[in-house]
Amino acid sequence: MAESINSFDSKSTLQVGEKSYDYFALDAVPGMEKLPYSLKVLGENLLRNEDGKNITREHIEAIANWDPSAEPNFEIQFTPARVIMQDFTGVACIVDLATIRDAVVALGGDADDVNPLNPAEMVIDHSVIIEAFGDSDALEKNVEIEYQRNDERYKFLRWGTGAFENFRVVPPGTGIVHQVNIEYLARSVFDNNGLAYPDTCVGTDSHTTMENGLGILGWGVGGIEAEAAMLGQPISMLIPRVVGFKLTGEIPTGVTATDVVLTITDMLRQHGVVGKFVEFYGKGVGELPLANRATIGNMSPEFGSTAAMFPIDEETVKYLELTGRDQETLERVEAYAKAQGMWLDPEKEVEYSEYLELDLSTVVPSIAGPKRPQDRIELNDSKAQFRKDLHNYVEADASAVTPDFDAEGPATENTSAQTAGTPASAADAKGNIPSAAAGAEGRPSNPVTVNYNGEDIELDHGMVAIASITSCTNTSNPSVMVGAGLLARNAAAKGLKSAPWVKTSMAPGSQVVNGYYEKAGLWKDLEAMGFYLVGYGCTTCIGNSGPLPEEISAGINEGDLAATAVLSGNRNFEGRINPDVKMNYLASPILVIAYAIAGTMDFDFETQPLGQDQDGNDVFLKDIWPSTEDIEEVIASSITKDLYAEDYANVFEGDERWRSLDVPSGKTFDWDPKSTYIRKAPYFDGMSKEPEAVNDVKGARVLALLGDSVTTDHISPASTIKPGTPAAQYLDANGVERKDYNSLGARRGNHEVMVRGTFANIRLQNQLLDGVSGGYTRDFTQEGGPQSFIYDAAMNYQKENTPLVVLGGKEYGTGSSRDWAAKGTLLLGVKAVIAESFERIHRSNLIGMGVVPLQFPEGESWKSLGIEGTETFDIEGIEELNNGSTPKTVKVTATKENGEKIEFDAVTRIDTPGEADYYRNGGILQFVLRNMMSGK
């Protein structure tokens, strides 16, 4: 760490017990004391890294004099203390760093000059896929398959730990990066050779914001931005607006942390917080356990905010103590936070840019779906809302709507509590077989009978095909995890079980969960419901749900059924969870089990029983719902500091499989030209020491014409590779058998696979084509512009030197911090993306890869302008960047085949001078490499 020039003379000494620390005192700068917590962290960051060049006295004064009402317009340079990665994005990062070493050597430099300057830590959590489930061997089977599939990748990462300084890897089978981060990796307040400063951390996963619950400022960035941060490049940003979110009251009985976070997500999405910090304050904050704060922080990308901060307080220190941090750390965190005015004072209200308020006592049980996290549904309305939404997923003539009718004849023994004509449960027998079509009156229904596990069962629209307790969002939270275990216990005691067509799974975010489940004796109850341990990793939440049983999959496809998934995750975008599933719902772990028992989303927990007990009595959800007292009692008796200490004692060592990997050595990597997993990246091929001039775009064609809320999943899916697609064709040509395709996410170290998988999501709707889903476009290099794979068309355009553009709607690039969504866009030959609005990370990633993001004029869209996608595009004004200034707008001309022109001024979304530098250099990594070679 370079020495600060300390122009405010702010360096001071903090005495904590017998130990003293240097620190940069905020009170040396007038105005810092009145700032929100998150801006105080930024202020300290600038004080400590002031170098008189990138960070000057003017930058520090700009933070201190922050105007809450102003729109962001002042650029600062944020220097994170560390970087975390997951393996899907992380492998690509290490491939890029290894490639940069090669480029440095080729330009006459030393490979040793390329190293992370601050801690860079990776947790391998994205590679485990749920192949096996429903039995006690599932974990071992899935781990074994994971190692077989990922041998090359894991050897490469082991090489990286030996080749690079400051780089460590948490091996597979340990947990999920964000949960491991808050439970172990997070420092809260650093002690760097006697210098104390706040832990700040960016990560190559958008849910890095989980650490915000611990008072750590950070957020998800693209892999390319993370690589630059590792190499010492500060992150360019505008001083943001800060939304104050006041919490009052207490969470009522029967309401979970998941319900709270879905409510907050709904509120903040409606309010609009893209590009802003959200900061929680008020007396209600003190009532929230740290795990609940982490759950809320985790969902920041779903709100759209950059960060969702909770200041440090007693609850923070209690959590650090529970998770095994030493006494010196606890004392340092508390003393530092109090000395810097960063300790939460519930009575004090600072000035924010905007305000929202939630009385926690008003929160009700909720789920979200069927395709966005912000689509919150109150549980009482879930059946009615499902029936409304179902019509969007079922062809009008593909399924008959079963008419409503009153049952005739006398009531049978177990129908007393039911609506007339409605079975006790969707999993009840219909025609003496378990049926997901039970109670289908009034909605589309298309029953399909299959034989599974020796039993005839009936599938239908709304069937819960997947019920998965997954994701760090919820598995880090003991209240909902213990609650799920107790609900399973109560259900088992009543003789209930999951519907036979449901693929059930339990994938905790750390081994600590296994520890307290064992201690509380809850595993046998969870397993009775089918929820066996399948792995420690992201699994279903990122689309690694694994295949459905063949019979179930065949039945769903035969009937073109709108099957559903219920998961305790953070994202439910279309096409993300499983290719056989059309509708995805987020729910608490407790409700995941409840829906597994119900077997269908077409279910009203208030009026419909889940089944009958041994005496034939109806059992409703309320009858098995665990009490708050029971949950707290299990937590108090089962979760101890020793559990965390034991599970994290040897966190970097791994199992015998990891330790026995045959690891290559050397400062530079010996690339295998036959590898289909790890290939040298092409971004520096032919790169000169000086950047070339940027050019206007002339004669471009539209590669994709897209609507609103196109996610980075749509652009660069992480899902399994579909046979027959360009990515599969490449693997076939390289001798890879279909069973070994693995997922696109697992192959992010190979650009040849990834460029072929760009815009290849099976749910992508390219509106250049009518009624076609998937990675297709029209290829205007051929007569009549026939339908073609997007990759094939892009390669034809490249042969003719025709540049490409992509047109989008609102919230383009929402979702994961997936740098391959930008890398793949570049490698396809796209020069510009024009959309109505961009999500923060993807906009930044596009610039970081040398693709210009442009925005339609306010209130306009490609549709309103009359653009059809068959036009050729010219973009004038980009060349102004060569003169050192960024044009506010550029002129776009779309010329139709008949010569008619559509002209408009698009807003240039290169928002800071730093981003302009990246774009002029062809990308952020080229900028960093050129600076490295010139000694800057």
UniProtKB/Swiss-Prot annotation:
CDD domains cross-referenced by the UniProt entry: AcnA_IRP (cd01586), AcnA_IRP_Swivel (cd01580)
TM annotation in the entry: none
UniProt region (Disordered), positions on chain: 401-449
Catalysed transformations (reactions): citrate = D-threo-isocitrate; (2S,3R)-3-hydroxybutane-1,2,3-tricarboxylate = 2-methyl-cis-aconitate + H2O
Binding site for [4Fe-4S] cluster: 472, 538, 541
InterPro entries from the UniProt entry: AcnA_IRP_Swivel, Acnase/IPM_dHydase_lsu_aba_1/3, Acoase/IPM_deHydtase_lsu_aba, Aconitase/3IPM_dehydase_swvl, Aconitase/IRP2, Aconitase_4Fe-4S_BS, Aconitase_4Fe-4S_dom, AconitaseA/IPMdHydase_ssu_swvl
Annotated family: Belongs to the aconitase/IPM isomerase family.
Name of this protein: Aconitate hydratase A
Organism per entry: Corynebacterium jeikeium (strain K411)
Gene: acn
